[in-house]
A protein has these predicted regions:
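C-terminal membrane-cytosol helix-exit motif in multi-pass small-molecule transporters
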Residues: 58-75, 93-102, 121-135, 374-379
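Residue-level hotspots within transmembrane alpha-helices of multi-pass secondary transporters
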Residues: 3, 34, 38, 95, ...
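Small-residue hotspots at the loop-to-helix junctions and early N-terminal turns
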Residues: 23, 183-187, 279
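Helix-loop-helix hairpins in multi-pass membrane proteins, especially solute transporters
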Residues: 1-85, 112, 195, 237, ...
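Transmembrane core module of solute transporters
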Residues: 48, 85, 110-117, 123-124, ...
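Structural signature of transmembrane alpha-helices in multi-pass secondary transporters
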Residues: 25-33, 37, 86, 90, ...
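Interfacial helix-cap and linker-helix signal at transmembrane-aqueous boundaries
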Residues: 39-47, 101, 175-176, 207-208, ...
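Hydrophobic transmembrane architecture of multi-pass small-molecule transporters
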Residues: 62, 264, 280, 284-379, ...
Length: 396
């Protein structure tokens, strides 16, 4: 992803054409994110589970051929050396924090292992920043964050990816296990988000030069917040129509945020910094996605497990522990129980999951609502240069 965005910045250095190209790129990124579960669900419904991984082979080969034939060659005048120490510190720091967030509901948030992982992640993050300051060829030159558009864009796209991927993670389980759709049917019901992204990305590419990242990103984050709020207030008896509204808002919001921030990041940098600037954009998306799944998944799991603790059932304690691992496991267990007992336990498990969606999706709504305020406060005005000063008066 960093290379593709950098290539667009080189081919379309400035102006409306670059913004439109980034709008198409953003739509492709977002649509691919949603189409992946759709295709995976269809494959699981018709073929061996390994086909979900094998499908990437022909796609990768096609991409390799297309890159060799179609992508123009471009490189920085001076190529830096690799920074293995920086790469290792960053990976282990992020992995430590994510592990702590994921394991918190199971091991306990105050357990020694979880607290140690949080502490290790914080210390390693500080060590990473210190190393980047003194390294001769740092992986992430910290000077690049002096560009206001890049710093704000990375922060906002991270928050957007947090909500986008975290919501998809929860929605797939909701569609399949609460609403009762097959994997293939679940994938199809993610389709409206992909279609909305396909329209929103190019549209944001038209709006961004006129309104600026501040307005377009704020509107996108507001739509993402609304999408999360719709799912946060969903009841177990609600059908797909309510989720459809959330999917449409999700696609529109993601398209606006990814396009506006990516365009601002590329437009704020000189050609020599396009590679590392694009890499920060990609890293922000990936970090936001991983954090969204970890945080929202942990909140969902915590409430779901607590909900099953309060359910009077004929399920033995050992089997109940297995049911707490996932709603899918609980429903499989319910099928083994006799008559009304199985039906009652399945309904209770579904209700516990929907109850867990409340805090999980509220986290997504809260993060993106904060993102709206940050966009209005931190994002540069329309016409801002790389340091955040304006070339023309903002009419908005």
């Amino acid at each position: 992803m960093p290379a593709t965005l950098a290539v667009i910045g080189n081919v379309f250095p400035r102006g409306a054409e670059r913004t439109k190209a980034i709008g198409i790129w953003s739509a492709a990124v977002g649509v691919g994110t949603v189409i992946g579960p759709m295709v995976g669900g269809w494959l699981l419904s018709h073929y061996w589970w390994g086909s979900v991984f094998l499908i990437n082979l022909p796609i990768g080969i096609a991409g390799l051929i297309a890159a060799a034939l179609l992508v123009p060659d471009s490189r920085a005048p001076e190529s830096g050396r690799l920074d293995p120490a920086g790469a290792l510190l960053s990976v282990v720091a992020v992995a430590s924090v994510l592990w702590a967030v994921i394991e918190g509901p199971d091991r306990g948030w105050t357990s020694s292992a979880v607290l140690a992982a949080f502490a290790a992640g914080a210390l390693l993050a500080v060590a990473f920043l210190a190393w980047q300051r003194r390294a001769a060829s740092p992986m992430l030159p910290l000077r690049i964050f002096r560009h206001r558009a890049l710093a704000a864009g990375d922060l906002l796209v991270l928050l957007g990816a947090f909500a986008l991927i975290g919501t998809l993670f929860v929605a797939v389980q909701h569609f399949q296990f609460v609403l009762g759709y097959s994997p293939g049917q679940t994938g199809l019901r993610l389709g409206p988000a992909a279609l909305a992204l396909l329209v929103a990305g190019p549209l944001a590419g038209v709006l961004a030069p006129r309104l600026g990242m501040r307005i377009v990103a704020a509107v996108g984050l507001a739509m993402l917040s609304a999408s999360s709020a719709v799912l946060a207030t969903t009841e177990a008896t609600d059908g797909y129509s309510r989720a459809l509204v959330a999917m449409l808002l999700l696609g529109w919001g993601a398209g606006f945020v990814i396009t506006a921030t990516s365009d601002a990041i590329v437009g704020s940098l000189p050609e020599t910094d396009l590679g590392v600037g694009s890499a920060t954009n990609s890293a922000a998306i990936q970090l936001g996605a991983a954090s969204g799944v970890a945080v929202m998944g942990s909140l969902l799991s915590d409430r779901y497990r607590g909900g099953l603790d309060d359910v009077p059932s004929p399920v033995p304690e050992s089997l109940l522990d297995s049911a707490k691992e996932s709603l899918g496991t609980a429903l499989a267990l319910a099928e083994r129980l006799p008559g009304e007992a199985g039906t009652a336990f399945a309904e209770a498990a579904r209700q516990a999951f929907v109850d867990g969606m409340g805090p999980a999706m509220s986290a997504g709504a809260g993060v993106t609502a904060a993102g709206v305020l940050l966009a209005l406060l931190l994002a540069p005005l329309r016409g801002a240069d790389t340091t955040g000063t304006t070339h023309q008066k903002d009419s908005s």
